[in-house]
Amino acid sequence: MKLLFFLPLIPFLVFSQISDRPNVVLFMADDMGMGDTSAYQFYTKNSDDQQIHTPAMEKLASMGMLFTDAHTPSSRCTPTRYGLLTGRYPWRARMKHWVLFGVQGDPLIEEDRPTLATLFRSQGYATAMVGKWHLGLRYTQTNGKPAAGWEDADLTKDV
């Protein structure tokens, strides 16, 4: 009899667990520091004329977690993205200096290399990337079909 009482509650328990998982939004912009947007004004104490007014970022920041002590492995975009997404020093990849250019070429992140995205997906998150990639792009194979890992991407549409 007690079991019959608890069975109808199971969906509510499952859904309450799902909603407890936080949403994660990671912003990364080239040449942007913590003091450049108003989202960190509470921390930097910069005056309004010293930063870009970003009300949407401010709202997201007020609802989430902010990092105030982050460091980059490089002053360049490609190695910084590689380090952030893989957790590895960028010089451990095949590219030892500078950045990757163009939209074709083999990806700098190996197909079997764990990334933030694979970690989040393993925990049931849906992942997406918008904007500059700069880590090597091999969207299509020579037969015109999407390359492994890009099957659900439609790269012909405007963002």
Show which residues each predicted segment covers.
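Formylglycine-dependent sulfatase
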Residues: 15-159
